[in-house]
Amino acid sequence: MSMIITILNGPNLNFLGKREPEIYGTETLKDIEQFCKECATRLGVRIHFYQSNYEGQLVEWIQEAIGVSAGLIINPAAYSHTSVAILDALKMFTGTKVEVHLSHIYHREAFRHHSYTSAAVDAVIAGCGGDGYWLALEYIVKRFNRNK
């Protein structure tokens, strides 16, 4: 059985391609999901890809990944700046965790410079657009293989 990596996307990411394309680009979340599936196939892993606008749903998916997924990629979107609940759920997940942001959050408004959720992850990738997901997938697979 191949390794599973869970990919979670937070609020408003379902509007990628339409919402502020000058910041987030024109790729849709479906484009990113397809790209992740192609990358996963090349890397020999499986992905579970989800999006929700609801904090509690993201927490539940993190909990469901415990003991199932070797790694977790999360783009918590605006919840990165507010959610202690997601932070606490991420702390419970013992696999490799990567936080991804499409935009460079440190080049944006000051309130976006602090991420609560990043305190519980192994790496943060910001400002690479959809390629950040590929970088996160590759990092998780390399780290898993190195620690076998």
UniProtKB/Swiss-Prot annotation:
This is 3-dehydroquinate dehydratase. PANTHER family: CATABOLIC 3-DEHYDROQUINASE. Catalyzes a trans-dehydration via an enolate intermediate. It comes from Bartonella henselae (strain ATCC 49882 / DSM 28221 / CCUG 30454 / Houston 1). Keywords: Amino-acid biosynthesis, Aromatic amino acid biosynthesis, Lyase. The record marks R19 as: Transition state stabilizer. One of its GO terms (biological process) is chorismate biosynthetic process. Belongs to the type-II 3-dehydroquinase family. Substrate binds at N75, H81, D88, L102, S103, R112. It catalyses: 3-dehydroquinate = 3-dehydroshikimate + H2O. Signal peptide: none annotated. Pfam families: DHquinase_II. Transmembrane segments: none annotated. SUPFAM superfamilies: Type II 3-dehydroquinate dehydratase (SSF52304). The active site is at Y24, H101. HAMAP family: AroQ. GO terms for molecular function: 3-dehydroquinate dehydratase activity. Homododecamer.
